[in-house]
């Protein structure tokens, strides 16, 4: 299979069979305004890239290139949006933009629609995932769990008076494990774990134990085939 790597100031890389392939989507001089920023590999194998400033791109394996989508079928633009995160949602792709926009794009009908998030106005959207039949949105003002079918939004925030609340309001990453638990990475509060039974978080932060985290600044979370959770940090490497 392919290993995909996004380096915002350089471009998109694909590694396969000891060969490294490079895809330069935008002008190098514009990398600060037009840069690849996130990736979604759908269940059918399609690879989609979300950009700052350039909309979204889909990988075409037939000619080994990316096809840019700058607007929907009605002319609503994607160009100019800063897309921080992208995930699969049935026939849709959900995108979290740092302007405080949560939008979805239908890959079949090519329609773009807004997803309203009550209480999440005027905040920075960092990451989005579709887990347990709901949309999970990480922001710089907590976590929002959205049920579109029921038109319901649950807001989860840091609360110093509640020991089982989030440890930090700034959410950077999310991951669902094979047991249905959800891991939340924060900017200043380490890792939060939400078991598959309630909305009370367990917390993992730096401590005196040799098996504890080395930092509270969490960037990425992922589970491997053995069930191990890999934790990428901002300033202390990787923990497992």
Kindly give the residue locations of the regions a language model identified.
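Carboxylate-rich, polar loop motifs that coordinate divalent cations or form catalytic acidic clusters
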Residues: 1-240
